[in-house]
Amino acid sequence: MADVREWRMHDVVDADGKKIGTLESVYVDTATDEPSFGTVTVGLPTRHRLVFVPLDGALVGPSYLKVAYPKSQVKDAPAIDTDAVLPAEEEPAVFAHYELPYTPGAGGERRLARR
């Protein structure tokens, strides 16, 4: 996968090409420093929020990032305010939403770090 950190502010679409929102930031796995989740801006212009989507299996297109999860699942994902960072205690819920295994980082530290 190309460096998805370069694709901030590009459209995020699902496997069917349906636009989900705009890639706002990338969270890396603290154990590998590899991109793990992206946050996508969704909602009405006056009520934007950021939802999390796994980047595993994502494909980069000319002006978009195609993720492997349906729009409906991404829109229902755990969300944070546009100026917030995911609290460590909420990380397990993000993984659980996508039925992904969660293990804390080394020494019980957080698993995801915003880049």
Predicted regions and their residues:
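Peripheral interaction segments used for macromolecular assembly
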Residues: M1-R115
